[in-house]
Amino acid sequence: MVTVSLSDALGQCTVSGITTPNGTNTSATSCLCETAGQTDCDLRPDVMIAWSALQTYASGPSEYPQVCSGGCSGNDGRLRVTGATPNIGNGPLNFRGVDKDGKRWFICGTDTFSIVDPNSTQTFSCPNSGLTKQLVVQRVYRKVGNNMRFTERFAGTMTYHPSHGHNHVDDWVTFSLRLAIANEPNPLNWPIVGTGAKVGFCLMDYFSCTSASGNGHCRNDHIYNQGTVLNQQSQFQNFGLGGQAYNCSPVSQGISAGWEDVYSESLDGMWINIPPGTCNGSYYIVAQVDPLNNFLESNENNNWTAIPFTLTQQAPANSGGTCGIISDREPVLCSGEQVVLTCQNAGYTYLWSTGATTRSITVDQGGNY
């Protein structure tokens, strides 16, 4: 009997040691393209956000009342959520703080700067002491016959998080609490009740899709309660491509093919703010990964998911709730002018002092509304 390690088995489909964009090697010999029979193709990632992890990880989601005390102090009016982002694609999601030439790139206002810093050890500050943002470099690998090659492109920004001690990709996931609307299939178009931060992640290989901890998170469909579970290496054309060891390095981070990153609800920023006056009842938690489409993937249409969730610790159902009112302009009217007033909180029904039952009303007279 001959024992072959996984790393040996993947030896002819690897990105390890690939530092030259157009080099000659045999590192892609056994890599498979998405289309059968092709020998020249991008090996792109396909990152999703897992509805099963959003629904069950760490026994969440966890809802807190508007006034929280004791063990939940500091979570007033929060709905804590977990984000898991599996990569079910043919190649790794690889983002880098250092490009192929050893340069790091920064944005200072409207200006772009670069420094040669191959190990990412130098400190850079904008000349005007303004906000410093480092540009993310995405490396996209390509199979050209037996050769593994790559291109690089800018893909958004990242920020150093002192509380975590490493860089996070900016705007990696967003979470919102929404009301489902009949005849609108896309949850991203549903009315927003509450939002959270645009959360940045340090991207790493946290769980394998084949592990007990990651089982069920990786599926071939992003829709709630749908999709075949991908928990076998044979279900991925290039399982492990990327190295299965990405971490929070300032030089290179990512998610290998067949792996996922997980940010638990216990971490900083992993919550949705529930507005005061929100009624108990049925809602949806909507999550989206890479909402700005900064990263190049094989499928850009499966980057969101939505799960049902029932609020139980807010205002009693059908109690009327409360609503902040916002206007589309300065609420001072001259003769012939109009202003649009909108209820800030999304709801199923509305009742204005004018008798109107729409979320927004247009008024042309001063008064209390």
Write out the residue ranges for each language-model feature:
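Boundary/junction segments of secreted and surface-exposed precursor proteins
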Residues: 4-110, 114, 316-323
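Sequence contexts marking disulfide-bonded cysteines in secreted/extracellular proteins
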Residues: 12-14, 30-34, 40-42, 67-73, ...
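Beta-sandwich strand segments
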Residues: 14-21, 69, 73, 90-97, ...
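Exoplasmic/lumenal beta-rich domain surfaces
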Residues: 172-173, 181-277, 290
